[in-house]
UniProtKB/Swiss-Prot annotation:
It is found in: Cytoplasm, Nucleoid. Residues 666-783 are annotated as: Flexible hinge. It comes from the Bacteria. SUPFAM superfamilies: P-loop containing nucleoside triphosphate hydrolases. GO terms for cellular component: cytoplasm; nucleoid. It comes from Escherichia coli O81 (strain ED1a). Keywords: ATP-binding, Cell cycle, Cell division, Chromosome partition, Coiled coil, Cytoplasm, DNA condensation, DNA-binding, Nucleotide-binding. Gene3D superfamilies: 1.20.58.850, 3.40.1140.10, Immunoglobulin FC, subunit C, MukB, hinge domain. Belongs to the SMC family. MukB subfamily. Homodimerization via its hinge domain. Binds to DNA via its C-terminal region. Interacts, and probably forms a ternary complex, with MukE and MukF via its C-terminal region. The complex formation is stimulated by calcium or magnesium. Interacts with tubulin-related protein FtsZ. The hinge domain, which separates the large intramolecular coiled coil regions, allows the homodimerization, forming a V-shaped homodimer. This is Chromosome partition protein MukB.
Amino acid sequence: MIERGKFRSLTLINWNGFFARTFDLDELVTTLSGGNGAGKSTTMAAFVTALIPDLTLLHFRNTTEAGATSGSRDKGLHGKLKAGVCYSMLDTINSRHQRVVVGVRLQQVAGRDRKVDIKPFAIQGLPMSVQPTQLVTETLNERQARVLPLNELKDKLEAMEGVQFKQFNSITDYHSLMFDLGIIARRLRSASDRSKFYRLIEASLYGGISSAITRSLRDYLLPENSGVRKAFQDMEAALRENRMTLEAIRVTQSDRDLFKHLISEATNYVAADYMRHANERRVHLDKALEFRRELHTSRQQLAAEQYKHVDMARELAEHNGAEGDLEADYQAASDHLNLVQTALRQQEKIERYEADLDELQIRLEEQNEVVAEAIERQEENEARAEAAELEVDELKSQLADYQQALDVQQTRAIQYNQAIAALNRAKELCHLPDLTADSAAEWLETFQAKELEATEKMLSLEQKMSMAQTAHSQFEQAYQLVVAINGPLARNEAWDVARELLREGVDQRHLAEQVQPLRMRLSELEQRLREQQEAERLLADFCKRQGKNFDIDELEALHQELEARIASLSDSVSNAREERMALRQEQEQLQSRIQSLMQRAPVWLAAQNSLNQLSEQCGEEFSSSQDVTEYLQQLLEREREAIVERDEVGARKNAVDEEIERLSQPGGSEDQRLNALAERFGGVLLSEIYDDVSLEDAPYFSALYGPSRHAIVVPDLSQVTEHLEGLTDCPEDLYLIEGDPQSFDDSVFSVDELEKAVVVKIADRQWRYSRFPEVPLFGRAARESRIESLHAEREVLSERFATLSFDVQKTQRLHQAFSRFIGSHLAVAFESDPEAEIRQLNSRRVELERALSNHENDNQQQRIQFEQAKEGVTALNRILPRLNLLADDSLADRVDEIRERLDEAQEAARFVQQFGNQLAKLEPIVSVLQSDPEQFEQLKEDYAYSQQMQRDARQQAFALTEVVQRRAHFSYSDSAEMLSGNSDLNEKLRERLEQAEAERTRAREALRGHAVQLNQYNQVLASLKSSYDTKKELLNDLQRELQDIGVRADSGAEERARIRRDELHAQLSNNRSRRNQLEKALTFCEAEMDNLTRKLRKLERDYFEMREQVVTAKAGWCAVMRMVKDNGVERRLHRRELAYLSADDLRSMSDKALGALRLAVADNEHLRDVLRMSEDPKRPERKIQFFVAVYQHLRERIRQDIIRTDDPVEAIEQMEIELSRLTEELTSREQKLAISSRSVANIIRKTIQREQNRIRMLNQGLQNVSFGQVNSVRLNVNVRETHAMLLDVLSEQHEQHQDLFNSNRLTFSEALAKLYQRLNPQIDMGQRTPQTIGEELLDYRNYLEMEVEVNRGSDGWLRAESGALSTGEAIGTGMSILVMVVQSWEDESRRLRGKDISPCRLLFLDEAARLDARSIATLFELCERLQMQLIIAAPENISPEKGTTYKLVRKVFQNTEHVHVVGLRGFAPQLPETLPGSDEAPSQAS
């Protein structure tokens, strides 16, 4: 027997009050005992959290005992955790004796919403010796331990051999593993399944009858029969598809003749017009080529006559172009002269402003020094006046208030101390430890002399600094000039670079003076170069016309040769009349042969089209008529073989269909009569009892029962006897077995199991030996497996049958096509190709035409050579006078050399213009660059040191001065003497006040006078700065304007510009004079050419009209060809046999087809409109659009699920083959797919009966359950009256409602819904569709009503409701219901799980004190009988003698809260035993 899985322990890590606690769980009942707040609910919450880690469901309410003095510390999940990492782990062992630890890592998330982060995990392969607390904690010392985070736990487990650690990202994966390993009873695939499981656990935890469960008992107890629903849905989908296909076939059959007629007439209509246009295009193209040849010849003649005119026009154009260039050059020279004059004026202004700026710069520097000195003196006067003002104010305030004077006298005692401090400071600064107030005056003179000496030294260095600074400024000025000219450079290179720049400046000035002579020389050479280039152009033009290059020395000889050639050509005469006549005679013979071949070509093309179609259909190539006849014999043999194979496959397919239908019967009955007999006898088919047997056990039970596997199990055989009399409608052998269908087992036989066989001892003298069948059919799983394999085989057979049927009909049609070909085209199909011979003859005709054309061209070429020779002589007459210029090869080099020298001179002039002023300034001061005053820095350091020494001496003198000034303060040693001399004090204050006021007056006068002087200095400085800035800005504007002008303003620029302007004016006058002469000559030449032009104008007009016509036709034909190729209809329209018909015949053919098409498309608005538009003869592409529209229309009408091709012509050919076969096959398939209403009712009834039997089996387990006055609990299952009526009508009266089930417009679900509405018109269906209602009616659970009933005291059986029961009774009843649900889940999930696993069973019960001792004992008995574990909680020990009891006490020690746990196992059968580890106190992590 398979052992049931158990929960071994629960481990809490870092929970509120539990740092590291493991609760060993009893195999039956584990009791948590303790007062309010002890941690019972926290422990159960940890268990539930590890079981269902879904934050959307978890909600732990306060369920502690009412009236307790201490309130509950539970605040949901967040309040039950402590800060840091927390764990809740369940240690389990399943039926395979595998240890599995599942749990969750919890951690509080910071924030006001009090969230908790949960990570589920599982550990497999853990040794039994390892405790859960050892895994997740690390001992630091004897009193401290640390909780490991999840990543460290993972690393720790991975280091252990054979241990597997899995972390889950989804709760579904976590529960899937728990289900597969037998930890939970049901596979939780969705959030809805998890919600049901949590509601069950929650109902168990809080006790009582859960309304959430009792209201939806059907969802909890009755499994969903999804297989039946899916079978109905697949059946309806298949029927719908089948009917749609049949309808498409019927539509296609009705349209088949229309398709043929439409395609045939549309092809004749469009192809005739297409080929007519193709023929006309070829004729027009030939005419256009002939016109082009004639026009080309005429243009050549006209070109020869116009040569003179072109030559003169070219020369005139050259002079016109030269005149424009000369005018532009002349205008540019005038503008340049104006710019040079403007630039010279600007340069004079710039020089004046630069001189003014230099003078202002010197004055500005001097004024800055004056202002700085005046500011220093002003600051000293302000300080002296402020000190005098403060002293006067102080003395006046002392005299105004006598009491204040007394305070001052008291203050002088403080001044005495300050005098002593001043004396000490003077000793320190002056390094005089023996200094006294009396000797301070002597030392003061000494240090004042030292200060004077330091001041004189500083002034001397300051004077040296000024001198050095002057030299430094000159060096900087020269250095900056060098940088401005040369660019950035090192200071030590300034002297060498400056000398180089001065030497370069001299050279540049020398070069700048050569600009004008070089420019005049360049102008002269350029004029000669232009004449030379003109002569070279004439020579190049002559060589180009002659097609050969000539040297200068050869020109005179060539002139004589051309004159001799002209004489010879004028005397030669060509006579080729006889040759021309022979060529024309041969051309006429070829034309006659071509005409005869064109008459034979259409017949041959028709035969070839038929032959090509046969080759494409059969995939063979035929080279003779004998090949055709031999292949026809092979075709007949192949047809016979395909028919035989098709019949064999069809027979096997029918056999498979019959077997599938037989195995698909509900209840496993292969004979429908057995179902009726079972209902009649009040029994159950043996196959239904064993319907749930697994696929592995099916061979055994099939062999065990042998022929009696289709027996009927009846409660009493004696009651069946009377039914057997006269029984005829039954199988040949009917087996009856007596037994209880609800508790039937296989103990009716004595069986010995052998290897793949059994021996059944039916009686003492009768044994039966049965081997295990290779293909078992006993049980639903075995039948479904066999049906699945049969379906796969049927699909293969159906596909093979369809292929063979298509091949047979295709072969038959191919045979007919061969027969037609032999009768019509075999005589001419294998003759030679007439079109190939026509092409050869056309090639010869073209050669003859070319020969005639060459004969004419030879004569024409001789005339052209004569004209060319005359033109050559004329050109040489113009070239020979300029031979001397052509021989001068160095002229261009000399021009380039002079131009380069001129560029250098102009660049030098630009350098002088740009840097001349800087070089002039640099030349007088360049000597200062020889030595860089580097000692200027050392001088600055010495000056700074002397300033520091002077400041030190001044401080020492000031310190001694302060001592000397405070000598009077040394006499204030006695305060009483100071107070007694009040009158003397008053007099002294007045004297001092007069002195202070006099000093203040002097300071004010000095300050006022110096302020006026400083203001004058600042005004002068501001005036200088303003003048300097204004002139600087004007100078910059002038320089920018000069740069914008872009002209060098040197001394000779104006003269050069004026000379250049006069030269260009003279050249322009000469060119205008020559142009006038050429215009007069050209006018005379054009008058002579007009006569020749009129002769050719008519020919040109005719040619262009024909060319325009050809181009227009070509554009339209290109659009037609593009449309034909894009739509793939060229093969249909380009019918080569039509090319040999005349235009009238083709037009007549197209008109006849048009009349037929008008009748054919009269009912189709779209095609009618397109046909009407295609009748326009000027728009041939519209006929193609009509043909494409016809093809598109036919493609849309042909269903791709019937005919898989895009070509309507091919589709029509395949259609005739497929339609009859598909119609027959689909009709039979619809009959097989349809299911009768009686079968539906039987399926639903059998399912309801099976589930009622299962509920009765569950009720048997609760018969002896009693809680208080409740003596028993049961589930009552009834069929709803309205649904029972529906089942009766479906099985008995379905003939009356065949209008619903035989309708093609309604699916079976919709027909079932309509029937339900017809039977129950009083029920409001709301907004639900008939399809939705029908699908609900196919679910057997909607036919049942379930409720929980209890047998309570004298009331008998009544509905279980919380209001009618006491608290303890409600808890016990609810627990019974939950046990029933868990057991039902296990039965439902048995197929999905391994057969060797029995899942864990565990429920909760909080606050179990509400149950009495008898109810507690009942719970214990129920747990023992059902092998179920139970965790209960109560304030006191309920039954310590049974199960395992934990006593929980919450304590506070040193501000640390923990729960003290003591565990006891049941002591009824043995002495009490303290559980291991119950005394250890929890440690807190430091």
